[in-house]
Amino acid sequence: MTVRVRLAPSPTGTLHIGTARTAVFNWLFARHQNGKFLLRIEDTDKERSKPEFTENILDGLRWLGLDWDEEPVIQSERIEVHRQAISQLLAQGLAYRCYVSEQELDAMREAQRASGQPPRYDNRHRHLTGDQEEAYRAEGREAVIRFRIDDEATIAWTDMVRGPMQWRGADLGGDMVIARRAPATTVGDPLYNLVVVVDDAAMAISHVIRGEDHIANTAKQLLLYQALELNCPTFAHTPLILNPEGRKLSKRDGVTSIGDFQEMGYTAEALANYMTLLGWSVPEGTEERFTLRQAAEVFSFDRVNKAGAKFDWDKLNWLNAQVLHGWSPAELLAALEPRWQKQGWVVSDPLWANDLAVLLGPSLTLIEDGVTQARPFFEEPPLEEDGLKQLEQEGARPALQALLSALELNAWDGLDVERAQTLLKEAAASAEVKKGVLMKSLRAALLGRLQGPDLITTWALLARLGHDRQRLRRCL
């Protein structure tokens, strides 16, 4: 059997990290099994589905390195196939038209809640006579189409993550709506559980890998597979992603879309690595930092956890820093320059930009940190509190004056480490202060604060633009 899995996102929003993690698990399983990873765009929600969301989803998958093997299936283009399946169920007496109005359904649910019962459809239109249907049509009522669910039925399957699973028909909320409300002589728009079954069968999907919030849907869909006499796939229900407090991750938690992570400066490699670890345990002796290709070699569902996976920002940040610290200067600069340009910063000297990237690289956790840390090299920074305090130290300003005087007396052709150390030593001696006091004061003058990258390299980079003397003058 050829393994065929699919990701089936709805283009009603941008690519969510939960969908992306599902994509990662599907892709890893397909690649490990030498199978196929497919896409189906479930765009049947006409009001909310937008082409720009489809493009966002596809772009996000490409960015993460999740390639697919066949042209994406567009679900809305198959609506007549879905309607044919519904007509088949109607003809076999396995589905029926239900004329209960929305107001009547609301009243039914309210009465059930008032009596302490879970809300469910009570199947009241399951056995309508022809005359009763005609009477409802005469009233102008439209009908949904419902699939009959036997309350006594037992639905069982073996889940690749959770093992043996079993549901009772009585726990599925009554007969299931499989087509929206429409005039009684037509079939309305087919709904999720029906179209998923029809499309997965048509795509010859062998394994359905999705979140645990779909478990109840799986029970319903298994009944539809049986009724339509379709081959049933194997199911795997992965754990939900939880926020650090243990609740389901949602938009209220802030960053949830892949685009948000990109904007913040996370790398595709680190994010894909981390999403793999959200619910999957690496085999013993395997490093937690890996590429998707490396993970695919050892991925299996017997190491996917049942419990929800808490999102750990510290772990993601550590992975991202490890990736950035392994980048070449050229790779780092390619990521930083577009962000610098977005700030309006013009780099006229490629060698200078390369040296700045080399200087900043070891301290970066996020690519966006390379904007924050680069700002003093493009813009004159304000003097922060710790910098101001340093400049008030005894001997600080006289030492900076001595350093500035030495710079202005000499037409330096460049500032190397040896020359910088000599200048610092001589200026400190001239002002009768310790060299360390001068170095702290110089950092405050150049960067506006006492924290930052290597001082001599910082000074040399600013000197190449003539900014060092200007910043010394403002502090005197």
From Swiss-Prot:
The keyword Ubl conjugation does not apply. It is found in: Cytoplasm. InterPro entries: aa-tRNA-synth_I_cd-bd, aa-tRNA-synth_I_codon-bd_sub2, aa-tRNA-synth_I_CS, aa_tRNA-synth_I_cd-bd_sf, Glu-tRNA-ligase_bac/mito, Glu-tRNA-synth_I_codon-bd_sub1, Glu/Gln-tRNA-synth, Glu/Gln-tRNA-synth_Ib_cat-dom. Keywords: Aminoacyl-tRNA synthetase, ATP-binding, Cytoplasm, Ligase, Nucleotide-binding, Protein biosynthesis. Its main location: cytoplasm. Its EC number is 6.1.1.17. ATP binds at K251. A motif ('HIGH' region) lies at residues 9-19. It catalyses: tRNA(Glu) + L-glutamate + ATP = L-glutamyl-tRNA(Glu) + AMP + diphosphate. The keyword Transport does not apply. PROSITE patterns: AA_TRNA_LIGASE_I (PS00178). CDD domains: GluRS_core (cd00808). One of its GO terms (biological process) is glutamyl-tRNA aminoacylation. One of its GO terms (molecular function) is zinc ion binding. A motif ('KMSKS' region) lies at residues 248-252. It holds the Pfam family Anticodon_2. GO terms for cellular component: cytosol. Catalyzes the attachment of glutamate to tRNA(Glu) in a two-step reaction: glutamate is first activated by ATP to form Glu-AMP and then transferred to the acceptor end of tRNA(Glu). Belongs to the class-I aminoacyl-tRNA synthetase family. Glutamate--tRNA ligase type 1 subfamily. HAMAP family: Glu_tRNA_synth_type1. Monomer. This is Glutamate--tRNA ligase. It comes from Synechococcus sp. (strain CC9311).
